[in-house]
Amino acid sequence: MGKIGKAVAVRARAFDMRILYHNRKRIALKEEKTMRVEYVDLKTLLKESDFISLNVPLTEETKHLIGRNELSVMKPTAFLINTSRGPVIDEKALVEVLRARKIGGAGLDVYENEPSLTPGLTQLDNVILLPHVGSGTLETRMKIGTLAVENLIAGLEGRIPPNLVNPEILKMRSSL
């Protein structure tokens, strides 16, 4: 369970939820006990959970981590929440499951083919779609502001900005 998963668990605990988790690496038993969380395999987590929050990086291993098979074992009242990376969910399969009302609903802040949306997703009344704002915490906004100022100062001092996205343009400009 990573940093984000632990933060979600703390919030879920405030609602007296039973917290199941699945992760590549199990946390220490002492930490599980302190956090009051239970490590289970993915299938058990999907079968037993009312709310499933995905908090994983996008890797070859996690691409389409949730697909047709995984969605089929979820409770008909379960809600799937994805604030991690869009391709973690096979959205075509999700649209089918939501349309057939085989799960309770979904909340998405990220999308498989961002900025495009999977056809049918916006026509569903059992999904909440957000414009990729899950990172909009005070902490991240402060870091974004700090990075912007650092980039401006570097540019004004004639240095290469630390977060330069397109260095080829800078090279072209200096050759003019």
Regions of interest found by a model, annotated:
Residues 4:
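Hydrophobic/small residue at the entry helix of a nucleotide-binding pocket
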Residues 8, 12, 74:
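Aromatic pocket-lining residues of Rossmann-like dinucleotide-binding sites
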Residues 22:
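The conserved SAM/SAH-binding core of class I Rossmann-like methyltransferase domains
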Residues 25-120:
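Rossmann-like adenosine-cofactor binding region
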Residues 114-176:
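C-terminal helix-to-coil terminal segments
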